[in-house]
């Protein structure tokens, strides 16, 4: 099964080539593509706030501890917005720079979207949107002021919201520290510190045991779920899950050294490009333009190693990430 799954990953290459072809053949495609993303993005943001204030979204879907909008039981609203943010921001700067009134409207949407990510309680998504912000602020030539202003205004709004309703703050900050055993000295002395949480720590140890037993090729793509209950891999009550919740650890466990080295090579090439751009920037030049840096900030999210992540082989997550590539080719 894992061989079949791996084989059909060529579809992502077809997806990128198809978009590149459309970009080259139709001058209006960028505009159509932008307004399509704009529609999806805006509807999600407005519906997310509607659900937050009313307890249910426009379709009547309620939420428990976290805002989900149209995603229902799937708590991926923050992840979806944060990952779509870089390509949307990049295209916005390209399409709306001549329309100042509309551009200020988009700034408002960006501020509201960043705040909504915080309200959704998705901690990884909140980290990613801030990582993208810092990336753009550090490496762009003209957009850094705009991105910095949006970030500051978003933080101010988040602070105000946290005072009015501290639930989101507890989920994103307080609960995170609690799960890592950083707030309870007695528990810390008894159990030690955890990597993000006890659940994550057990997943990571289990995945590492799988790697030690299958160093070259791993246990197979999407096979963590099938082997995590094996006694020789179990590391505690939270050993099992659909995936290890970290891309690099998942690749190590499921594809072994071969797959892991390929991912590290991609990370190395990416860092080399960014290092080259940084050198150019210090000389008042640019290796990448601001539009490309915005897109690269989206790729940086996927390559950042030290954060809990979704399934590396998740089709939806991969498609959103690949949306950045055609505009860089």
Language model: regions and residue ranges:
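A membrane-periplasm/extracellular boundary helix in multi-pass inner-membrane enzymes
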Residues: 120, 140-191, 203-213, 221
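Alpha-helical transmembrane segments of multi-pass inner-membrane proteins
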Residues: 10-14, 18, 28-63, 71-164, ...
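Selective detector of the "anchor" transmembrane alpha-helix that sits immediately C-terminal
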Residues: 254-276
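Long extracytoplasmic/lumenal interhelical loops at the membrane interface
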Residues: 184-255
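Membrane-interface catalytic loops of GT-C/OST-like multi-pass glycosylation enzymes that act
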Residues: 4-5, 71-75, 120-128, 241-246, ...
């Amino acid at each position: 099964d894992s061989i079949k799954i791996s084989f059909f990953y060529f579809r992502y290459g077809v997806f990128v080539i198809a978009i590149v072809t459309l970009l080259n053949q139709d001058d209006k495609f960028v505009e159509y593509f932008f307004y399509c993303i704009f529609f999806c993005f805006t509807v999600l943001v407005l519906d997310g706030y509607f659900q937050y204030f009313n307890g249910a979204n426009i379709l009547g879907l309620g939420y428990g501890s976290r805002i989900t909008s149209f995603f229902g039981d799937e708590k991926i609203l923050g992840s979806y917005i944060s990952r779509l943010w870089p390509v949307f921001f990049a295209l916005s700067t390209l399409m709306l720079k001549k329309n100042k009134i509309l551009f200020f409207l988009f700034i408002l949407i960006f501020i509201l979207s960043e705040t909504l990510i915080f309200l959704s309680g998705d901690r990884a998504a909140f980290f990613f949107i801030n990582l993208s912000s810092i990336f753009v602020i550090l490496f762009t030539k003209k957009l850094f002021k705009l991105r910095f202003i949006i970030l500051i205004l978003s933080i101010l709004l988040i602070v105000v919201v946290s005072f009015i309703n501290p639930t989101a703050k507890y989920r994103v900050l307080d609960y995170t520290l609690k799960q890592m055993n950083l707030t309870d000295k007695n528990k810390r002395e008894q159990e030690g510190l955890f990597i993000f949480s006890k659940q994550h720590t057990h997943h990571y140890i289990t995945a590492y045991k799988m790697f030690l037993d299958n160093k070259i090729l791993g246990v197979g793509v999407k096979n963590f779920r099938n082997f995590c209950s094996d006694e020789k891999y179990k590391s505690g009550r939270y050993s099992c899950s659909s995936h290890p919740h970290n891309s690099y650890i998942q690749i190590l466990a499921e594809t072994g050294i071969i797959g892991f080295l390929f991912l590290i090579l991609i990370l190395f090439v990416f860092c080399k490009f960014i290092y080259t751009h940084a050198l150019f920037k210090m000389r008042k030049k640019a290796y990448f333009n601001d539009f490309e840096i915005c897109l690269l900030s989206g790729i940086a999210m996927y390559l950042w190693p030290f954060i809990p992540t979704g399934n590396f082989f998740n089709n939806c997550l991969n498609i959103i990430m690949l949306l950045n590539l055609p505009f860089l080719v």
